[in-house]
Design a protein with these regions (language model features):
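N-terminal leader segment of winged-helix/HTH proteins
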Residues: 1-27
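Alpha-helical linker/hinge and terminal dimerization helices associated
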Residues: 9-12, 16-19, 57, 100, ...
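N-terminal helix-turn-helix DNA-binding core of bacterial DNA-binding proteins
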Residues: 18-60
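Alpha-helical DNA-recognition elements
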Residues: 22, 70, 133
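Short, hydrophobic-biased segments on the C-terminal half of alpha helices
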Residues: 50, 68-69
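Charged, amphipathic alpha-helical coiled-coil/dimerization segments
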Residues: 69-129
Length: 142
């Protein structure tokens, strides 16, 4: 049987998203919203711009705007004009969003611990090299 790593990777990513969505749903979140809260929670000292979120999650400005607007409506974060550049939006968790940081980070840590227990850190690091290869591909590179 021929292996197709890209296909397996895509299937695994879908399954991982389904699992994250299932966890996030109990807090009226999507997996993407959960990931953004986790990202903002880990960068507490930094001033986060919408542009930083776009780069971190490899999404377009319009997609980021839509996601962040929905999170604003839910009272999870607020966006405001950056002090140093009026064209940029700063993003900050509200108290409601901050309440979810611990739950989300514990969930993410437990997922990582399960992975490490099952495969060991060496195999995970090797797999991360494969993932990094895919992340660095651009366009029609072979």
């Amino acid at each position: 049987m021929a292996y197709n790593t890209g296909r397996y990777l895509k299937m695994a990513a879908r399954q991982l998203t389904k699992n994250f969505d299932q966890f996030a749903r109990q807090y009226d979140l999507t997996s993407t919203q959960m990931a953004i809260i986790d990202y903002l929670g880990r960068r507490t000292a930094a001033q986060i711009l919408q542009r930083d979120i776009e780069q971190e999650f490899n999404i377009r400005r319009s997609t980021a705007t839509l996601i962040l607007q929905r999170m604003e409506r839910k009272g999870l974060l607020q966006r405001f004009v950056a002090h140093h550049d009026a064209r940029q939006k700063m993003v900050q968790l509200t108290a409601k969003g901050q309440e979810l940081i611990t739950l989300i980070s514990q969930y993410m840590a437990s997922q990582q611990a399960d992975l490490e227990q099952h495969f060991g850190t060496t195999r995970i690091r090797e797999f991360e090299e494969v993932l990094q290869y895919y992340l660095n591909l651009e366009g029609d590179q072979h």
